[in-house]
């Protein structure tokens, strides 16, 4: 009999394989770690692989900071073929001759760098009236979608052998790389879809740091938690504040504490022993608790 689930806290950088959903990968890791509470920080489609940070226990309180972080991807485009879903899982809608050269592809990329508008794909988890768009799409219902602004920080041609091209994308959260591929194909006059997609970075985390499910499974059950990063790694971009024990205890109890420094905004708070207390808002000469680590866990 599997032992009772534990209060596991931390972040697992997972290298999700192709062929499973992000939730299936999460549930497998949760089972292997015997964890009570878990969540991920941004879905990868089943056909995609790469970095999928998973949050456990107290770390789930800070997952939004990574969910909203920039992402990096390596995408393989098939020019001249469009599919219903914009990826290899959808039926082929049209095939066209590809006349674009590598020089043409490279010349088309700058138009997609910066702030651009995207119409979210129907085959996405974006919700309309409480239901994900992909449910409407499967039922053959088309929903009008408003364009959304996203930011493409960088878009580079990594490899080129038409009708295939490999591009590296650095983008804001909420960017649909499938839509970017389709729009690039349209700009080249031939259409396109993604045949593969790998997330190579999320926030400050890199794919090279990630563990596979096979690696997690092969690790002794008692040593698996050693693969987790501490919860405060999710907010490492914020400035830190170290408090004495009395002030830290007050903050843990949900009370604001005086702050002598002239600063504003969110800060990471640590006690005198370097233990992460949580996040506080620096305002008007005090630190106001915003998101705290539970000191007693069931």
UniProtKB/Swiss-Prot annotation:
Query: Record's Gene3D superfamilies?
Result: Pseudouridine synthase (3.30.2350.10), PUA domain (2.30.130.10)
Task: Tell me if Transcription is a UniProt keyword of this record.
Answer: no
Q: What does the record give under GO molecular function?
A: RNA binding; tRNA pseudouridine(55) synthase activity
> Which UniProt keywords are given for this protein, alphabetically ordered?
Isomerase, tRNA processing
Any idea of its EC number?
Answer: 5.4.99.25
Read off the InterPro entries from this record.
PsdUridine_synth_cat_dom_sf, PsdUridine_synth_N, PUA-like_sf, PUA_sf, tRNA_psdUridine_synth_TruB, tRNA_sdUridine_synth_fam1_C, TruB_C
Q: Report the sequence similarity comment from the record.
A: Belongs to the pseudouridine synthase TruB family. Type 1 subfamily.
**Top-level taxon of the source organism:** Bacteria
Q: NCBIfam families of this UniProt entry?
A: TruB
GO terms in the biological process aspect are: mRNA pseudouridine synthesis; tRNA pseudouridine synthesis
Entry annotation: catalytic residues: 45 (nucleophile)
State the protein's purpose: Responsible for synthesis of pseudouridine from uracil-55 in the psi GC loop of transfer RNAs.
Name of this chain's protein: tRNA pseudouridine synthase B
Q: What does it catalyze?
A: uridine(55) in tRNA = pseudouridine(55) in tRNA
């Amino acid at each position: 009999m599997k032992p009772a689930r534990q209060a596991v806290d931390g972040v697992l950088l997972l290298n999700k394989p192709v062929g499973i959903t992000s939730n299936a990968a999460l549930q497998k890791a949760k089972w292997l770690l015997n964890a009570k509470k878990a969540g991920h920080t941004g879905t990868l489609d089943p056909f995609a692989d790469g970095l999928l940070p998973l949050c456990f226990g107290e770390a789930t309180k800070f997952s939004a900071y990574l969910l909203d972080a920039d992402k990096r991807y390596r995408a393989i485009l098939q020019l001249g073929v469009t599919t219903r879903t914009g990826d290899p899982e959808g039926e082929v809608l049209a095939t066209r001759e590809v006349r674009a050269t590598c020089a043409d592809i490279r010349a088309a990329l700058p138009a997609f760098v910066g702030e651009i508008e995207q119409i979210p794909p129907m085959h996405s988890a974006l919700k309309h009236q409480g239901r994900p768009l992909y449910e409407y799409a499967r039922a053959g219902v088309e929903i009008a979608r408003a364009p959304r602004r996203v930011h493409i920080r960088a878009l580079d041609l990594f490899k080129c052998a038409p009708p295939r091209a490999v591009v590296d994308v650095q983008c804001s959260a909420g960017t649909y790389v499938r839509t970017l591929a389709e729009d690039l194909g349209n700009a080249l006059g031939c259409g396109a879809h993604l045949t593969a997609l790998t997330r190579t970075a999320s926030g400050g985390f890199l794919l090279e740091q990630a563990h596979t499910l096979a690696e997690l499974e092969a690790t002794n059950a008692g040593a698996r938690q050693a693969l987790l990063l501490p919860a405060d790694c999710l907010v490492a971009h914020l400035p830190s504040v170290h408090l004495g024990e009395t002030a830290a205890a007050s903050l843990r109890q949900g009370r604001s504490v005086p702050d002598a420094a002239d600063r504003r905004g969110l800060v990471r708070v640590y006690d005198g022993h370097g233990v992460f207390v949580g996040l506080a808002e620096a305002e008007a000469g005090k630190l106001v608790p915003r998101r705290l680590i539970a000191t007693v866990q069931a």
